[in-house]
């Protein structure tokens, strides 16, 4: 890659990182509810009308205690609309007792150990030459990239999910709201 191309890529990445980082707010609103940095992931998520499906799934999978714990965690939180994109009946099937192992695997695939703000992810993307690999609590990986100023995650099956609200700071980590459910292998 010649110097001009390197500079163009660097400028595009820096613009994207700046736009993403600027989306961070003090006590942002998610799903019509203020998110407080003094509350944990579960305490905040239960108040978001956009995350009722996620909260129900977390409860069914027995992950409430974990996500109320000290962490820190980075959670890529799918909205109700993200779950609605799944084939009809998928959520109901996953919530059945015999499928809770699969549900837990999908949910923990949305969690990365540690607190990673958009700025932290942007640094990893820059250091990775335009891509960053994030290892999830489930054990799989997500690929993070910038696309026109937006942070996009690619899952193990090649599906993509865009961060729509970044840097929702919690007492035990950070939430990034995403528009599509990510799928592990």
Regions found by a protein language model. Give the residues of each.
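Mature, structured domains of secreted/extracytosolic soluble proteins
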Residues: 22-185
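Bacterial N-terminal signal peptides
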Residues: 10-18
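Bacterial N-terminal signal peptides that target proteins for export
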Residues: 1-9
